């Protein structure tokens, strides 16, 4: 049976992640934010049995393996942190954790020009390593010889790890847009990346953030892939963002996109 084209395999990977993301989003919308927690009855303290201790140790090891990321692909799996330069008279510099996959094998033409790079933006309640595992993007990257960058939203910045695509400063190119653009530039300076072939891809809140990043930096992002994401300009606050997640966007995005392009041209 002939292999599916790379675009079809990418879509299938995102569909798998999309199923997981829908269950997570239902927890955000219908979960603790809208329903009070029930009080639990107190239970007597019991000493853990040997079997329970072994299960707990196994669970801890499993979580450690998840943080370590995919281990079945021969390329390099690099975990690091990007620290943005603070502007004068601004808040302390913000830090952004990220993971980077570099393929073990590259075609000769790719090696001469540098690796193409896909920036993968996870959804709410996800981590970068979970997104990498769920989409299997590293396996595809190894087969084709391109790098994959996985930024990870901080729980300090957003308690549910949602990218703040809805923030007005972010939509205008500041905030998390500037942070991600700075991270991409930093990675390009450290590794042999083909700057003409940098792509952004995301799911849910990550899709919204990928669209904002591409619209504000068309000179940096060659193309975008969006899955289950809000349209640009659909919300300007967290409350509006939750409404969009539940009911969709009412107004078409053309006006917001046109306004952004006019600001860039000015």
Regions found by a protein language model. Name each.
Residues 169-191, 212:
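Alpha/beta-hydrolase active-site loop
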Residues 134-138, 166-167, 217-219, 242-243:
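Glycine-rich, phosphate-binding/catalytic loops in enzymes
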Residues 95, 114-115, 145, 195, ...:
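A structure-centric signal for secondary-structure junctions around beta-strands
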Residues 152-175:
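Cap/lid segment of the alpha/beta-hydrolase catalytic domain
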Residues 90, 109, 140, 189-192, ...:
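A general structural signal for stabilizing positions within well-ordered secondary structure
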Residues 189, 195-259:
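Primarily recognizes the serine-hydrolase "nucleophile elbow" in alpha/beta-hydrolase
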Residues 106-115, 121-159, 234:
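Short substrate-entry loop that stabilizes the transition state in hydrolases
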Residues 1-117, 129-130, 201, 205, ...:
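A domain-start/cap signature at the N-terminus of enzymes
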